[in-house]
Amino acid sequence: MSEKWDSNSSESWNHIWSGNDTQHHWYSDINITYVNYYLHQPQVAAVFISSYLLIFVLCMVGNTVVCFIVIRNRHMHTVTNFFILNLAISDLLVGIFCMPITLLDNIIAGWPFGSSMCKISGLVQGISVAASVFTLVAIAVDRFRCVVYPFKPKLTVKTAFVTIVIIWGLAIAIMTPSAIMLHVQEEKYYRVRLSSHNKTSTVYWCREDWPRHEMRRIYTTVLFATIYLAPLSLIVIMYARIGASLFKTAAHCTGKQRPVQWHVSKKKQKVIKMLLTVALLFILSWLPLWTLMMLSDYTDLSPNKLRIINIYIYPFAHWLAFCNSSVNPIIYGFFNENFRNGFQDAFQICQKKAKPQEAYSLRAKRNIVINTSGLLVQEPVSQNPGGENLGCGKSADNPTQESLIEEMGEATNSTVA
């Protein structure tokens, strides 16, 4: 497994295993250290397995349903929904390739698969993580253009597909050096104790083998900048601009408000809260893992600290990062009314308050996540003397913003249902 995403691929095994129920024997003047096959007691391993199983199920079910809904419903073939579809696909790859192998890495010693699987799994893991992060940026850019610059031409479906191809191309290019350097290596001074009958086995590990340690540091720094720091900066800046723009227009809706004006103002508040949620989730999910990886490469930690970090803290950091792929379907999909209705329609779920299918079809066509007309305002609006429909805070200078707020409220994750 690529050591960028696993937890135990340290080059200093003597630091990790020191004091971890090891025995030393001398063979041909070589100090052999025996380590247990299972890294944890059954109770601790059970906690790891149940925790990873939970996010794995959420990731697989949630992202599969999102893919099914977008592909099945033609009225949802829009720019933002295609980005959400791409996000779901990349998150599915995270669930398939990252979660199980990382869990295995956290509970057993060594690499149980061959050399080819070492390179393939490491490459796919890195690509899926990078593609997921880059897609979050693409969604932020799409929303930013629509809200802050509503008069600029909207992205077309063709442009969205080109963007998606670029996303995967960049992800492959960034992670290729890691795949090239990944090799399965034998741990000459360690053997795994397989049973109580003193049966042992050679320890193999899948890790990056750089010619110089400085090259590894440089590559880790490049990954940190391109997969975390730069995307985080872009997401925070663009969502801050979106929030400021919505807050500015919401200020015009103060004082005496008609019910519809109050409703639009509340929608703006919900969107602003949603934007803060997106940025905070991204920061909190990935910051611990990147902090640990940078610490591992740039600091000299004591053997005891290294052991604690690799055996206990790294698994939690990976779990937290993978949680982002599990909650993405919720915050980007199921808080969207179209996705909820599509879910009900796809699986023929009848609820007491469900509207007739004809009404849903009409509403779904009107609620397309991103449209180019800018004239589809869902709420009742007032009319000016010239006959133009205007909502609170909407003027001839910005006739599309209320439409975009409606769409943002539908298309994006919201903390308020």
From Swiss-Prot:
Membrane-spanning intervals of the chain: 46-66, 83-103, 120-140, 161-181, 218-238, 275-295, 311-331
Cytoplasmic side: 67-82, 141-160, 239-274, 332-417
Subcellular location: Cell membrane
Transmembrane is among the record's keywords: yes
GO cellular component terms given for this protein: actin cytoskeleton; plasma membrane
Membrane topology reported for the UniProt record: Multi-pass membrane protein
GO biological process terms on file: G protein-coupled receptor signaling pathway; regulation of MAPK cascade
Stretches of the chain found on the membrane's Extracellular side: 1-45, 104-119, 182-217, 296-310
Matching Pfam families: 7tm_1
The entry's keywords: Cell membrane, Disulfide bond, G-protein coupled receptor, Glycoprotein, Membrane, Receptor, Transducer, Transmembrane, Transmembrane helix
Disulfide-linked positions: C118-C206
Region called Disordered, residue ranges: 382-401
Keyword set includes Membrane: yes
Entry GO MF terms: neuropeptide receptor activity; opioid receptor binding
Glycan attachment residues as annotated in the record: N8, N20, N31, N198
Function in brief: Receptor for NPAF (A-18-F-amide) and NPFF (F-8-F-amide) neuropeptides, also known as morphine-modulating peptides. Can also be activated by a variety of naturally occurring or synthetic FMRF-amide like ligands. This receptor mediates its action by association with G proteins that activate a phosphatidylinositol-calcium second messenger system.
Family statement: Belongs to the G-protein coupled receptor 1 family.
Protein name in UniProt: Neuropeptide FF receptor 2
